[in-house]
């Protein structure tokens, strides 16, 4: 008898959910930092990043990340260059949103989304909302 393995189905990553309609950036950054072993909260990162009711700038997220001892940089990239723990900036209509990449394959993108949790979206759909702007956060090498 095969036992259902919930961990392999859901994954072992932490997903920090956003607490407001404008805190997706700090929540996405908290997701990445916690998965890198850095203790932090969405609220702490929102304060460090200067988040307000209009949201969070990528520069603010970079400042928050570096204050937690990791390197962070904003870059432009294609979907094929996205990797695990990259924070992608997407736009649908007038709504801008940060989401964390878990995996990319030929057909789908799996995301740790601050608003919706773990989701899978077809690559062709994602290509319509992906702006090409990505925050890359990495542990600094000693």
From Swiss-Prot:
Keywords, in A-Z order: Hydrolase, Protease, Thiol protease
Residue intervals of the Peptidase C39 domain: 18-137
Entry-linked InterPro entries: Peptidase_C39
GO molecular function: ATP binding; cysteine-type peptidase activity
Pfam families from the UniProt entry: Peptidase_C39 (PF03412)
Coiled coil: none
TM stretches of this protein: none
Protein name listed in UniProt: Uncharacterized protein MTBMA_c00490
Organism annotation: Methanothermobacter marburgensis (strain ATCC BAA-927 / DSM 2133 / JCM 14651 / NBRC 100331 / OCM 82 / Marburg) (Methanobacterium thermoautotrophicum)
Native organism taxonomy: Archaea, Methanobacteriati, Methanobacteriota, Methanomada group, Methanobacteria
